[in-house]
Amino acid sequence: MNLTPKEIVKFLDDYVIGQKKAKKIIAIALRNRYRRMQLSPELQDDIVPKNILMIGSTGVGKTEIARRLAKMMGFPFIKIEASKYTEVGFVGRDVESMVRDLTNAALNLVKNEQREKNKDKINEFIENKILEKLLPPLPKGISDEKQEEYKNSLEKMRTKLRNGDLDESTIEIEISQNMFDTNPNLPPEMGAMQDIVKVIGVGSKKVKKEMKIKDAKNALKNEAGEKILDQESIKSEALKRSENEGIIFIDEIDKIAVSSGNSNRQDPSKEGVQRDLLPIVEGSNVQTKIGTLKTDHILFIAAGAFHLSKPSDLIPELQGRFPLRVELDSLDDKAFYEILTRPKNSLLKQYSQLLKTENLELDFDNEAIKEIAKIASRANEEMQDIGARRLHTVIEKLLEDLSFEADEYAGKKFVVDKKMVEEKLGDIIENKDLARYIL
């Protein structure tokens, strides 16, 4: 999607309140990707993305900015936590696995696009598979009259199938089952082995299962995709997108910084993780199940609160790989008010729509919204600052009884006013010990 930086920021304004500096820097970084692709291949190789370091408390919009943009522009995107990785040689996930996770995200993205483009062919394949079970093909040498009868019956059955009239009927189908797919605890590094066993036919078998037709349609989608879609071109496109459009969001990078003021270094592998991360961010080749991926042009966005450490506590080489730094603003009551009123799918709209399913019309008057914003802001000041996430706990507590008794208000309109907010939350916010547990 070809958007100017201003258009990108305008899009983000619908979902993330404030944080103009962060939006501007990320918008420029994404636009530079488009600019790079317009250049000659020789120049493209030399121009590397300027990675970004976002500094700010939890809940101020760091992840949301990157995730919204990646989704809108159709870029492969993953969010990982730096603290979950271990130095090579230690038990745990190594940093290269984040690149493999990115290729998996790209693979799913491209597969879904191809499935959408070829949905008519895929649906036809699924229909034919199901119709074969409902109306087995005629043997050879049957008269023309019988063939015509069969053809008419087949079309009638096809119409019923498309209309959903047969959804509750039960059929027996054969589906492929991979022994690796049945174990959710296998690490992603097993991807290469899964590909090998698929090629040689070990570990995969056809199993017969009885199920309703509506379930059979979903079960046959993967098989249809494997048969109809060009798997090699999908892998090639996924690899290309990972390299040129991939975004890896590294959260909690402050957790692997070794604080200069902390003489008791409890985790000596922190610096090791940084050193393992360095070649990935600098640009290196990583083996994935879809091929060798060059990380030179992946955009890395690192983020952290840096309460107990500073960006300068990261090793100098890694600091140099994140030249763009932006500090995100903490959220006050005015920002909370905007968060509750401005976004397309604001929190209040979400709760209103949820209760609408119970035939209850929920509304908030303006003074009530201001009071909610004040209480959330105060809770963040007096307790740990968790940013906009505080609004979730505040509103949940406010609407707890109403959500529980929603059926009693069916067909009515319920307006939340300032008085109700004060009654439900006033005593709690005044009692700091109680507030720590509830809000």
UniProtKB/Swiss-Prot annotation:
GO terms for cellular component: HslUV protease complex. It comes from the Bacteria. One of its GO terms (biological process) is protein unfolding. Keywords: ATP-binding, Chaperone, Cytoplasm, Nucleotide-binding, Stress response. ATP binds at I17, G59, V60, G61, K62, T63, E64, D251, E317, R389. It is found in: Cytoplasm. One of its GO terms (molecular function) is ATP hydrolysis activity. Its main location: cytoplasm. InterPro entries: AAA+_ATPase, ATP-dep_Clp_protease_ClpX, ATPase_AAA_core, Clp_ATPase_C, HslU, P-loop_NTPase. SMART domains: AAA, ClpB_D2-small. Belongs to the ClpX chaperone family. HslU subfamily. A double ring-shaped homohexamer of HslV is capped on each side by a ring-shaped HslU homohexamer. The assembly of the HslU/HslV complex is dependent on binding of ATP. ATPase subunit of a proteasome-like degradation complex; this subunit has chaperone activity. The binding of ATP and its subsequent hydrolysis by HslU are essential for unfolding of protein substrates subsequently hydrolyzed by HslV. HslU recognizes the N-terminal part of its protein substrates and unfolds these before they are guided to HslV for hydrolysis. This is ATP-dependent protease ATPase subunit HslU. The lineage of its organism: Bacteria, Pseudomonadati, Campylobacterota, Epsilonproteobacteria, Campylobacterales.
